[in-house]
Amino acid sequence: MTTAMDESLIVHGEGFVLRRWRPDDLCALLRHANDPLVPRGLSERFPHPYTRADGEAFLEGRVVDVRDPVLAIEIDGQACGSIAVRPGQGERRYSAELGYWIGRTYWGRGWMTRIVGTYVAWAMQTLPLYRVQATVLDTNPASATVLLRNGFVEEGVSRCALLKPDGLHDLRVFARVNPPAAVCVPVCASAPA
């Protein structure tokens, strides 16, 4: 497992680098995160407006657990988004919840598809994880497409799961699994009909 002190954590991809956030990323973080369209597809943990105090709190680890691999997405030498998994605990320690966002400048150009593919492959191998899950707001079909293109399967919908300023929304549930064969127990297959 990575730690908050692991500043050397770098994952290279095609045209991008995933790395730990740094204090000198503050201006770039504010530039991309304060766009009013960015938080529309995210939970309200992602504030708008995104203030300097919000950025400082995030970079200091007061918003998310920086012991988890919360990485900056760097394109063209600047941080322009974030991607992370939050590993489960106890009996769920081999599964994790995936979250990500990228600045609007990079939307619609295939960046997140490549970034999610690279990051999830790295996380599943390195941590190790057998399941990575993501929830997608019903109004964010682009994010659902990113997941589907990276081997995620839509498992269902959590109805009326999230209250946003414009009303209640469903959350679509996606997962990518890669369990070792020795661990799989086909419980459902052996259950009486």
State where each predicted segment sits.
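A short helix-loop-beta-strand connector motif used in the catalytic cores of GNAT acetyltransferases and
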Residues: 60-72
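Acyl-donor (CoA/ACP) binding surface of acyl/acetyltransferases
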Residues: 1-27, 31-37, 70-193
